[in-house]
Amino acid sequence: MTTLAIDIGGTKLAAALIGADGQIRDRRELPTPASQTPEALREALAALVSPLQAHAQQVAIASTGIIRDGSLLALNPHNLGGLLHFPLVKTLEQLTDLPTIAINDAQAAAWAEYQGLEGDITDMVFITVSTGVGGGVVSGGKLLTGPGGLAGHIGHTLADPHGPVCGCGRTGCVEAIASGRGIAAAAQGELAGADAKAIFKRVGQGDEQAQQLIHRSARVLARLIADIKATTDCQCVVVGGSVGLAEGYLALVETYLAQEPAAFHVDLLAAHYRHDAGLLGAALLAQGEKL
């Protein structure tokens, strides 16, 4: 069975056909509409899937935000603008006339990365550190989504009660400090206004402030991982995302994790599927799992 997989992100929409063998073909991308209106998103999705839908038997969506009953929600509803409660599943079923499932993109990526692990692993956690910080939890060989779709939103756990206000509305979340957006927001002086990519580049040039910002992010992530180990007793943690996979970052996280008591240590692995993880994970879930 061929699945039409769709990945809905803050800046881009992606779609591809994925066979039962997990091979990705005919991958396409469009920019996410700047206008946060249901009409604009529906039109963009229609343009994205129309060349592909005739070759698929089902649709699987991986999307930013919380997916509940097939609709799009967010920790902070204001972040979605007019897309709050957008009916993802219903819309794609109408556009394609195919059975459709939808899941959070980090949860989908977690499932893809879990399927790619070697050895007898039943419990793992995936963390993506990019513009934000998200995640997914696999326990006993099953992906946890939760009755309300919130499971795995680990970027919104507490890192610093006196830290910056997060986009979700809480104060001091991991995401507000460790994410690419959090790194950039803390930059001052010469680095003010620089994004995380530029700050990483300055690390390689020996910039002291840039090094401090990246170390701060890695230290917060290591503490999060120790908390995750204590909560889930997972066998490994897979780290992805543009920040998580940046040169030298995972090694820094490992250094800070090693400073935690031994009971909270866990194997850290770099994500394998990178930007295709959401597409692949959603397709794998549609092909073999009931959400």
UniProtKB/Swiss-Prot annotation:
It comes from the Bacteria. Keywords: ATP-binding, Carbohydrate metabolism, Kinase, Metal-binding, Nucleotide-binding, Transferase, Zinc. GO terms for biological process: N-acetylneuraminate catabolic process. Gene3D superfamilies: 3.30.420.40. Pathway: Amino-sugar metabolism; N-acetylneuraminate degradation; D-fructose 6-phosphate from N-acetylneuraminate: step 2/5. InterPro entries: ATPase_NBD (IPR043129), ManNAc_kinase_bac (IPR023945), ROK (IPR000600), ROK_cs (IPR049874). The keyword ATP-binding applies. ATP binds at residues 5-12, 132-139. Zn(2+) binds at residues 156, 166, 168, 173. It is an enzyme of class 2 (transferase). It catalyses: an N-acyl-D-mannosamine + ATP = an N-acyl-D-mannosamine 6-phosphate + ADP + H(+). SUPFAM superfamilies: Actin-like ATPase domain (SSF53067). GO terms for molecular function: ATP binding; N-acylmannosamine kinase activity; zinc ion binding. Belongs to the ROK (NagC/XylR) family. NanK subfamily. Catalyzes the phosphorylation of N-acetylmannosamine (ManNAc) to ManNAc-6-P. This is N-acetylmannosamine kinase. The gene is nanK.
